[in-house]
Amino acid sequence: MHCPFCSATDTKVIDSRLVADGHQVRRRRECAECHERFTTFEGAELVMPRVVKQDGSRQPFDEEKLRGGMLRAVEKRPVSMDQIEQALTKIKSTLRGTGEREIKSEMIGNLMMEQLVNLDKVAYIRFASVYRAFEDVSEFGDAIAKLQK
């Protein structure tokens, strides 16, 4: 690995640790030339399935779109970034675990709602109201009633 400080090619690993529930390796490295230390993260590159939209079009899975949807739902709610990242990791693991090359966007929305209902009920209602396109107050009431069961 090249040193980010002096671009030398000779670096050595000083320390390695598992992070992110064992899904990544954190390595502390030192440059043999300038002796600067830096941290790298290594993870498996796993291919996500393509997303089939409701109109039948297909597009690559977009993790940032997933993250953005969750961040909008939990905005100004007492949910930590760690909780959000864990929920996103669970969603991605479930999608990869299907073994399918393509998945429907509906499945992603349902997985998102499963995670949000466990994180924050208000965030769940926010997301569900947009995802399910609530038309009036009674639909909000129905969703809240389901949460209270």
From Swiss-Prot:
Q: Write down the superkingdom of origin.
A: Bacteria
Question: Keywords assigned by UniProt?
Answer: ATP-binding, DNA-binding, Metal-binding, Nucleotide-binding, Repressor, Transcription, Transcription regulation, Zinc, Zinc-finger
Please name one Pfam family that this protein belongs to.
ATP-cone
Q: Name one GO biological process term.
A: negative regulation of DNA-templated transcription
Q: Which cysteines share a disulfide bond? A: none
**Which co-factor is required?**
Zn(2+)
TM ranges: none
Q: Give start-end ranges for the coiled-coil region(s).
A: none
Family membership noted in the UniProt record: Belongs to the NrdR family.
The record's listing under NCBIfam families reads:
transcriptional regulator NrdR
Q: What's this protein's name?
A: Transcriptional repressor NrdR
